[in-house]
Design a protein with these regions (language model features):
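Residues that scaffold the ATP/ADP-binding catalytic core of kinase and kinase-like folds
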Residues: 12-13, 25, 47, 87-91, ...
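Active-site neighborhoods of divalent-metal-dependent phosphate/nucleic-acid chemistry enzymes
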Residues: 46-49, 60, 71-118
């Protein structure tokens, strides 16, 4: 089974008090089956840049972590192609869904993956298989 993880999932273990269910999900899941999107890397990079504006050292630490994520997932980073963009366009007609969340749903659908996210409500109507590790 393959999973596409949202930014909130990849970020959870880094929190001062990460959710035990999320940590357990990561331990139980074959890492080779976990993928991230270029969108997630973009959101993480944005987070590092925002952190650097407040505290340069914290921003560098955050960016170092983002670089480690990018290296660790090197072969498991999914881009946005024409098929994903077209499906996203179709999914966006039914109702307004946050762009990144709906692009992640389209990516997971095209690749036959389960989307792992806490934002279940945002993608519930897309038809994507969803797993919320906070509730597993």
């Amino acid at each position: 089974m393959s999973f596409l993880i949202d930014t909130n999932v990849i970020s959870e273990p880094r929190r001062p008090q990460p959710d035990a269910n999320v940590l357990s999900w990561f331990r139980r899941t074959d890492q080779a089956g976990i993928f991230i999107s270029v969108l997630t890397l973009g959101e993480l990079t944005r987070g590092a840049a925002k952190a650097a504006r407040r505290d340069a050292a914290a921003g560098r630490r955050f960016q170092k972590w983002v670089d480690e994520i990018q290296t660790g997932f090197a072969e498991r980073v999914l881009g946005i192609d024409l098929k994903i963009a077209s499906l996203w366009g179709e999914l966006s007609v039914a109702r307004t869904v946050p762009v990144v969340d709906s692009l992640l749903a389209a990516t997971a659908l095209v690749h036959g993956m389960t989307l792992v996210t806490r934002n279940v409500r945002d993608v519930a109507d897309t038809g994507v298989a969803i797993l919320n590790p906070w509730e597993s």
